[in-house]
Amino acid sequence: MVPPIHGDTTILDKPEKWHGKSIEDIVGYRLSLVRGVMTYDIHTITGKYIESLQELVMADKPAESEAVFEKKPVPDVDQLKRKGLDIESPPFGPVGDLKIFRTSCSIKADRRLERVYYDRDLKAKNGIISLYEKGVDLSTIQRVLSLGMLGSTKNRRLVPSRWSVTATDDTISSYLVKSIETNNAVDYYEVYKYSHFGNYYSIVLIPDHVWSFEMQEAWFDKQGNLGFAVDFEDANGLKQYPSSVAGAYFAARLAVAEYLSKRKRKATALVLREIHSEEYVVPVGVWQIREGVRQALDDKSNLKKEFESLETAYKYACSSLSVSEIEWTRNSKLYRNLRRTQLSIHHFFPGMFHKQ
């Protein structure tokens, strides 16, 4: 995607810079970008066009580029479908077939990106983790993966943007979950809340000696019918791809695991996401889920509430949401499992789940 203007246009395609912006601002950023299309085999990771894109991604500061199209780009939904682009992803402006694409001849590469790009023995997974630990923005890591710049030579390939986002979130969150295994559990039942773009979040962290995670999503359709999506993992990890919640699952899991890693703690986590379609009128991508959960868990925002029982914590988590606690409970597999386990233990050890 290229902006039709000169200067530093980083904010137009950099979710990390969008906190505090309105949905109108973000849609405006996206619609100002023109998307050029060229069709390539996924195994084609060389050639003038691909290498130009790779240079742009590795640049340590914004660089100039020029795109010439076969004909005037148009914002046509049917055209987007024909070109295989995902119309459910963040919006973007006009799209058209590229004729020529050129970049500035004075691009200086970010050394962190350059190292993993030229390391042809480094596995893609390890490259992703290395870049994350060195402070590279997630959106940049996702683009590096998408352009076939990570992994051993024989395994490098182009990756659709949506897949690269999910793969990056999954890889980093799995690494972080593994890293917190030996940490002490949180002391109390903790609840965090945050809302933006018509997305309302409640996160419950539960004292436990093992990691478990569940994400629930609830929404009302145009007819007023309630919809639910739920995916979860226990201490053994995911048994299959979380097809109900999909990429949002990994985005939320990354934010939670990241927070626990910084605190040097571990917990079982429940994430409730309620979507108000009258406010969330245009989907802006799973980045808003990751950033929404991050903001909820941000220590500086002082949003944490502590409780001594799972029931009171869960009740508080549901209290600011339109969907009733009964519905959230009915659709939650992990919460009901935890309740059954705690009731059984409480029968033999009264007061075990209350601080003295």
Task: Give names to the regions the model predicted.
Residues 1-356:
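Long, low-complexity intrinsically disordered regions enriched in acidic and polar residues
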